Design a protein with these regions (language model features):
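Short, structured coil segments at secondary-structure junctions
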Residues: 58-59, 67, 173-176, 236-237, ...
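Hydrophobic packing residues within well-ordered alpha-helices of enzyme cores
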Residues: 51-55, 169, 250, 266
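Asp-based phosphoryl-transfer active-site loop
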Residues: 4-19
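Mg2+-dependent phosphoryl-transfer enzymes with acidic/Ser/Thr/Gly-rich catalytic loops
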Residues: 1-5, 23, 194-276
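Active-site phosphate-binding/coordination module
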Residues: 21, 26-126
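Short hydrophobic/aromatic-enriched beta-strand-loop microsegments
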Residues: 60-67, 179-180, 240-244, 258-259
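Conserved acidic, metal-coordinating active-site core of Asp-based
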Residues: 109-224, 228
Length: 276
């Protein structure tokens, strides 16, 4: 039997929405898959540093980060596709002028403007009641924009208070950037939030690159996701699996819909396809 390649979105897929924990059944499923010779990758909108938040639990060797703009394996960065510094400044200045929140994401750290920093600070006590605000920001490698000193950036996240303001922003996004609406931490914002990467950078692109690197066929790839930034990877892999808690669009595009992320969705899907 050919080796299988497993790609997992994080927030809303591997990490149950609302609980911010990885289920024991998911940890067990990953262990069994590894024992069977499967190659597992996180495939996330998070930066590399933030993607490692749960690495002690899951020990996955591969990480596709920043929605496909970077690939790492066994602790080594294999490639990144950076947004030019001039474009980063132009976009963040525009978001600020329109009253929006943003965070710019590099390999190791995330830098946020004050509005975005407050938005996360307000949600952390609910999501992580046992940790202080400082501990959570450190855990997620998040810093204020004042601490940014020109590091390479792979992704820009943005959000606005209204769709009208967002539309003004969309009209001024250059063709050199790829845009994905409402994924990951922004999945509940509709058209008011999204993510920007270098043109052509998507999770689907990165899945294809990983398969090329390993000399593998897309038929042997299984991709798990729950929101719009997962759409491209579900389309390029042999089997696209949507979580039961996923958006209607992602479920319609999937080959299979499993249980919710917090109801053993990953474990049950891997069982269904006889991977474990």
């Amino acid at each position: 039997m050919s080796e299988k390649y497993l790609f997992f979105d994080m927030d809303g897929t591997m990490i149950a929405p609302g609980t911010h924990h990885i289920l024991p059944s998911t940890v067990e499923a990953l262990k069994q898959a590894e024992e069977k010779g499967c190659h597992a990758f996180l495939c996330t909108g998070r930066g590399y540093g933030m993607a490692l938040e749960y690495q002690d639990e899951i020990k996955i060797p591969g990480v596709v980060f920043s929605n496909g703009a970077g690939i790492a394996y066994e602790g080594k960065i294999l490639e990144t596709h950076d947004i030019g510094q001039e474009t980063v400044k132009k976009m963040t200045d525009l978001i600020t002028a329109l009253g929006g929140g943003f965070q710019i994401i590099g390999v190791d750290y995330i830098w946020q403007n004050a509005k975005e920093h407050r938005r996360f600070a307000e949600r952390f006590p609910i999501e992580y009641p046992d940790l202080s605000e400082e501990e959570v920001f450190a855990r997620k490698a998040m810093h204020l924009i004042d601490e940014y000193h020109g590091e390479a950036i792979q992704k820009i996240d943005f959000n606005f208070d209204s769709e009208l303001t967002a539309d003004l922003f969309f009209a001024r996004i250059p063709a050199s950037l790829e845009i994905v609406l409402s994924g990951g931490y922004y999945a509940n914002l509709g058209r008011r939030g999204g993510e920007l990467m270098k043109e052509g950078m998507t999770k689907g692109y990165a899945v294809k690159r990983v398969l090329e690197m390993f000399g593998a066929d897309s038929h042997d790839a299984y991709c798990f996701g729950d929101s719009m930034n997962d759409m491209t990877m579900l389309q390029v892999c042999g089997t696209g699996i949507a979580m039961g808690n996923g958006t209607e669009d992602i479920k319609k595009s999937a080959d299979y819909v499993t249980n919710d992320a917090d109801h053993d969705g990953i474990y049950n899907a891997l069982k269904h396809f006889n991977i474990i």
